[in-house]
Every structure is written in structure tokens, then in C-alpha cells.
């Protein structure tokens, strides 16, 4: 499809349904082919798409480059950079739409490629908000995976924290000793099982005004949670009566 703005270009991209065997291989490159006026130029142009979208195959055709441009110049070319930005924005927009319109199909896609896309969260780029828009995580209070916005909307806490715990699998994390206090207080905790999350969460630190906070590192203060606050605001005679009943 056309990618807009002043540059004349078209791109035909595909969302794969299964992982390529070399997805995590260090030498894995993107699978995009670049054409200029329908003449093939290169299929080894790393700057055409971010590494964390390397699983997206397709073709890009532009009229804004010379047919005899060298590969070295292509790697740091303003037109290529514009095309890369436009392609990336379009892919992320389509993924956000897929999540909204076909959640089951998106979930299958996310299980295969979510960890790769989240590599983009520990890179310096302008796409973090778009990635967060559709990124989903396991959590302690629901069986299905949730977005960070869902966490905030459904389980907002007065500490302005997004609590998480990381480990090898969901079951072990749910049975972790550190989880007991949070379960007792009905505080939702993200269950982080993708190794990539342990890289970007400490770096990102915040989502909107909420801090990412590991429940296994340092002291987590829950004393001012809403339930505790409600109890502390009760009149003294009510507290005495409750204590008597206990």
C-alpha cells in the first residue's frame, strides 16, 4: 500500500503466522526487498526496517532514489530513513487494529513474535507508545493476558506502581513467596516470563505516570494501599468494635 507524505513509494508487507527457524539467530536480517521504479536494488538493506521487525517479509518500491545508488549510501540515506519510519508506523498501526478486531488471531501472533517486538522497547526510538498500545502480559488476577492500559484502568493503585515479578513460567511465579502479600491484598502483579522484559522494564522505568516496580527487588511498601487507608480512616470506636469481634 502507499505510505503517504511527499515521497512516492509503495510497500507490500506480510504478517507471518509462524516463526522462521532463524528468528533469534544473530545473523538474521530482515526479509524486505527494495525496488526503485520496479527495478530490484537490494534485499540486504538493514536500515529499511528495525531489527525488532525482522520477521516481516515484503517488498518496497520507491521513485525517490537513483537506480545506480550504492549500498553504502543507502544505509545512511534520508529517503530510506523516511521509508523505514513510515513502514514501522504502518506495521504497528495494523497490529493495534488486529488486536482490537481479531483478538484471538492477535494472541496467536503475539505468542510467536511478541518477544521480538518488545526488543524495540530497549532501543532508543519513537515507537515505544505504539508498541505499548498492543503489548500484552500475563498477570496474577486474570487468566487472559492484559495490556498496560488495562492494568491501570482495572487495577489502579494509589502508589502509582505497575508491579511485576519475573521468572521462567507463570505457575512458578504465582506460587512464589513474594506473591502472598499481593494476593492477600488483591493487588495485580504482571507475570513476566519473556527474558527481553527484564532488559527494558528497568530502563523504561515508567508507563505514563506509573513506575515499573519489581516485587522481588528492594522493599515494596504496601502500607498505604486503599484497603489499609479505608481501615485507618475509620472512627476509633469502630476500630475497637472490629477488634472486639476479631
PLM-predicted stretches and their roles:
Residues 1, 5-246:
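Conserved GHKL (Bergerat-fold) ATPase module
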Amino acid at each position: 500500500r502507499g505510505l503517504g507524505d511527499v515521497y512516492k513509494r509503495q510497500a507490500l508487507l506480510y504478517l507471518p503466522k509462524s516463526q522462521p527457524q532463524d528468528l533469534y539467530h544473530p545473523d538474521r536480517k530482515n526479509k524486505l526487498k527494495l525496488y526503485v521504479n520496479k527495478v530490484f536494488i537490494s534485499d540486504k538493506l538493514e536500515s529499511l526496517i528495525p531489527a525488532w521487525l525482522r520477521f516481516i517479509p515484503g517488498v518496497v518500491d520507491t521513485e525517490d532514489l537513483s537506480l545506480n545508488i550504492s549500498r553504502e549510501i543507502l544505509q545512511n540515506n534520508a529517503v530510506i530513513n523516511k521509508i523505514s519510519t513510515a513502514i514501522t508506523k504502518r506495521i504497528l498501526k495494523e497490529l493495534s487494529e488486529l488486536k482490537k478486531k481479531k483478538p484471538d488471531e492477535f494472541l496467536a501472533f503475539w505468542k510467536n513474535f511478541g518477544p521480538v517486538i518488545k526488543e524495540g522497547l530497549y532501543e532508543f526510538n519513537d515507537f515505544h507508545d505504539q508498541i505499548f498500545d498492543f503489548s500484552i502480559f500475563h498477570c496474577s488476577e486474570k487468566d487472559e493476558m492484559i495490556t498496560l492500559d488495562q492494568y491501570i484502568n482495572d487495577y489502579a493503585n494509589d502508589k502509582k506502581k505497575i508491579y511485576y515479578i519475573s521468572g521462567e513460567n507463570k505457575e512458578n511465579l504465582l506460587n512464589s513467596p513474594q506473591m502472598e502479600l499481593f494476593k492477600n491484598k488483591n493487588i495485580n502483579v504482571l507475570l513476566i516470563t519473556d527474558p527481553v522484559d527484564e532488559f527494558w522494564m528497568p530502563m523504561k522505568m515508567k508507563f505514563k505516570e506509573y513506575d515499573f516496580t519489581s516485587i522481588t527487588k528492594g522493599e515494596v511498601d504496601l502500607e498505604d494501599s486503599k484497603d489499609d487507608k479505608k481501615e485507618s480512616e475509620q472512627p476509633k470506636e469502630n476500630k475497637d468494635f472490629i477488634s472486639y469481634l476479631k
